Amino acid sequence: MNLFDFFRERKKQSSASIAKERLQIIVAHERGQRSAPDYLPDLQKELIEVIRKYVNIDNDQVQVVLEDQGNCSILELNVTLPDR
Amino acid sequence: MAKILVVTSGKGGVGKTTTSAAIGTGLALRGHKTVVVDFDVGLRNLDLIMGCERRVVYDFVNVIQGDATLGQALIKDKRLENLYVLAASQTRDKDALSAEGVGRVMDELRESFEYIICDSPAGIEKGAHLAMYFADEAVVVTNPEVSSVRDSDRMLGLLASKSRRAENGEEPIKEHLLLTRYSPDRVNKGEMLGVEDVEEILAIRLLGVIPESQSVLKASNQGIPVILDEQSDAGQAYSDAVERLLGKETPHRFLDVHKKGFLQRLFGGRE
C-alpha cells in the first residue's frame, strides 16, 4: 500500500455508515406513507380515470400528495397536461 | 394489575423466542407470577427453548376452542415456582386463533398472573397481529442489520395503529428496543450498526443490548433459558434488561470490545 492508497482508504465510508444512511432514507419514506390514509391510492386511480375522460394522460402525469400541516391536511393534485 | 407484554420484531430469527423465554424466566426469578404464551401456531418452539416440550398435553388453540381448560393447558416450569408456559398448537389451520378467543384467554390469564409474555411469530399476519393486539408494552427485538431495523420500524407503526389500545384511543403501547446479536468488535471496525445508530433511527427507549454469544445456542441446546446461565454475558445482559423493565436504572454493559488478557491470549480462553 503506498501513501496515496493510505489516504484514500481513510476516506472510504464504512459499510455501517452506508447502512445507517440507507435506513434513514427508507424509514423516513415509509413513515410518510404510513400516515397517509388507506383511500389515497384509490382516490388517485379514480382521479386519473376522470381526467382521462377529457385529456389523454399517463399515470405518472398525475401526482396526488397529502401534506400534513399540524391540525389540517392539504391534498395536492398536480396534473401535467400534454403539449397541444 | 396484570401486564401484557408482547415480544415482537417483524423479521424472523432475530431472537424473539430466546427473549420471551429469558424475560419470562427473569420476571419469575424476581418473584412475579409469569406466563409465557407462544403465538406461533403451526411452528411451536417456545416449549423447546423452555425445556418443557415433552410435557405439552393441551395447547393455546385447545383452550380457545374449549377442548381444554386453561388450568389443563398451562405447563408449570420445573425450575421456578412462578413460571408457566402456554404452548402454541401445531395445527395447520391458519384461522385457529380468533381475536375473540385470544381476548377471552388473555382476560382469564390476567386474573391469576402479574405478567403475560406473548411470544409473537415473525411476519405481520394474523398470529403476529393477535400477539400484539392486547399488549400494554412491547419489546421490539432487533438485530443491528438493515432488514431487521426496517422491519422493526414497520412493527412500531403497527403497534401504534393496529392494537386494542390504539383502536380504543387509550394510552399507546409502551415500546422498548432490545438489540440482540450485538458485536462491539464489528461495530468498532465499522462493519455493524452501533447502538446509537439503531436508537437514532427507531427513536424508542433502549431496554438492553444482548451481545452475540455462544451461550445462547448452548442454552437452547439444553432447553434452559439463557438468563439462568449467570456466568454468560448474554444471560447477564438479559438480567439487566429485566431490571430495566421493572423500572430500575442500570448502566448498559457489554457495549465495548472485551479485551483479552495476556494469559487468555496466550492460551486462547473460551467465552
UniProtKB/Swiss-Prot annotation, chain A:
Does this UniProt record's set of keywords contain Cell cycle?
yes
**InterPro entries per the UniProt record, alphabetical:** MinE (IPR005527), MinE_sf (IPR036707)
Q: Which GO terms describe its biological process?
A: cell division; regulation of division septum assembly
- Entry keyword set: Cell cycle, Cell division
Q: Which domain of life is it from?
A: Bacteria
- State the family it belongs to: Belongs to the MinE family.
Tell me, in a sentence or two, what this protein's role is: Prevents the cell division inhibition by proteins MinC and MinD at internal division sites while permitting inhibition at polar sites. This ensures cell division at the proper site by restricting the formation of a division septum at the midpoint of the long axis of the cell.
What is the name listed in the Swiss-Prot or TrEMBL entry for this protein? Cell division topological specificity factor
Annotated organism of origin: Azotobacter vinelandii (strain DJ / ATCC BAA-1303)
Native organism taxonomy: Bacteria, Pseudomonadati, Pseudomonadota, Gammaproteobacteria, Pseudomonadales
Q: Which gene encodes it?
A: minE
